[in-house]
From Swiss-Prot:
Protein name in UniProt: U4/U6.U5 small nuclear ribonucleoprotein 27 kDa protein
Primary residence: nucleus
Record keyword Phosphoprotein present: yes
Protein family per UniProt: Belongs to the SNUT3 family.
Swiss-Prot/TrEMBL keywords: mRNA processing, mRNA splicing, Nucleus, Phosphoprotein
Comp. bias (Basic and acidic residues): 66-96
Subunit structure as annotated in this protein's UniProt entry: Part of a tri-snRNP complex.
Length: 155
């Protein structure tokens, strides 16, 4: 290692001209950062806006969820149109008793046919398969972070 060299007096003089300006600027920045630290809350949760009205974001392309919603709405509209088209016609009324005709007008159908093996629109075919999942255990004792903290999230 070489010996430390002191600055030349000329360089020191040149620096001294702007020191008062620099010192003032540094002091202002320091006070500003201190205020910012004081204002910052200690909570880790993301900052909530004061106004409850939703913010408007301008984006060129709609988000995937919006596209999906739009597609779902279009499907619903097409289904509604199909349902409207299926009105009771004169051909349907042929060979029916008055009671059956009355029932058709009230309920929208005349007979109690089975739908087994037929495709049915709507939520009629919304069934779920019983999926057995492996049980997830939560560790209560001997945890790394100690006891006084929330349990680990298990989805």
């Amino acid at each position: 290692m070489g010996r430390s060299r002191s600055r030349s007096p000329r360089r020191e003089r040149r620096r001294s001209r702007s020191t008062s300006r620099d010192r003032e600027r540094r002091r202002r920045e320091r006070s500003r950062s201190r205020e910012r630290d004081r204002r910052r809350s200690r909570s880790r949760s993301p900052h909530r806006r004061r106004s409850r009205s939703p913010r408007r974001h301008r984006s060129t392309s709609p988000s995937p969820s919006r596209l999906k919603e739009r597609r779902d709405e279009e499907k619903k509209e097409t289904k509604e149109i199909k349902n409207k088209e299926r009105q009771i016609t004169e051909e349907d009324l042929e060979g029916k008793t008055e009671e059956e005709i009355e029932m058709m007008k009230l309920m929208g159908f005349a007979s109690f046919d089975s739908t087994k093996g037929k495709k049915v629109d709507g939520s009629v075919n919304a069934y779920a398969i019983n999926v057995s999942q492996k049980r997830k255990y939560r560790q209560y004792m001997n945890r790394k972070g100690g006891f006084n903290r929330p349990l680990d999230f298990i989805a």
